[in-house]
């Protein structure tokens, strides 16, 4: 029987694809380091809104330099202004509730629950844009709910904080809304520029929250370690994560990049266990794997 010869893949093409997967993995790992800086700053008695202010202020400065280095302009239209303000609002809500949840539950579990947002994107698209819900979407949602049930009791056997769970849910649904808006509102500008303006408007909303409902104006850091962790949060899980993601999408596309996003909560869980002594049991591992599996299925099926 004659066999169809396998296509020969040039070595350079294989190396190029490998770089794309490496960039996607690095993007996810970088984003998963959020708890590392946040929890160290919490230990120095800084509030979530203060930590986020320094994270995004640093990121905005770094992205400003990146845009200048690329020779891009900062001009935006009135329509783009309105969309970017909305992006900034949901970005602020998602970030604030996510960081606040670290006060009520292990950061690794919070990061895993945040990763439910791809499922929520599918539900939002079905409800508001009449996108058909396929069988694999229903299966993914059911599997993720089993995973959440397994996570209901933390590693020490104590039920998860209701406040913490609601904060993470608010964070994931806010991020899902942000993703749906970004998908439906086609802005004629690059990802770096969109993120720069979203972060700038996010800073405005964070300051409004701080002075009205939060801890007041962000205090000036007084320790070198505080500045170091603040800079780390602005650079690693924000700017580097974005740059690596953009490079990955250009090389291998959005679907493989989204699938490798599963490394985000894996990184956060690893940091929680190794650095902060968070407890990880067999039941929690099973719950985490079910949630990651369900969201990876969603990412793999969505085109």
Segments the model singles out, each with a brief description of its role:
Residues 1-29, 60-86, 127-138, 156-163, ...:
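Membrane-interface interhelical linkers
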Residues 28, 54, 110-116, 181-204, ...:
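Helix-helix packing/entry segments at the starts of transmembrane helices
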Residues 30, 35, 67-108, 113-114, ...:
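Specific transmembrane alpha-helical segments of multi-pass solute transporters/efflux pumps
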Residues 36-48, 103, 152-161, 211-230, ...:
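Membrane-interface helix termini and inter-helical loops of multi-pass transporters
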Residues 62, 67, 98, 117-142, ...:
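C-terminal transmembrane-helix exit sites in multi-pass transporters
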Residues 63, 85, 133-153, 172, ...:
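Hydrophobic transmembrane alpha-helices of multi-pass small-molecule transport proteins
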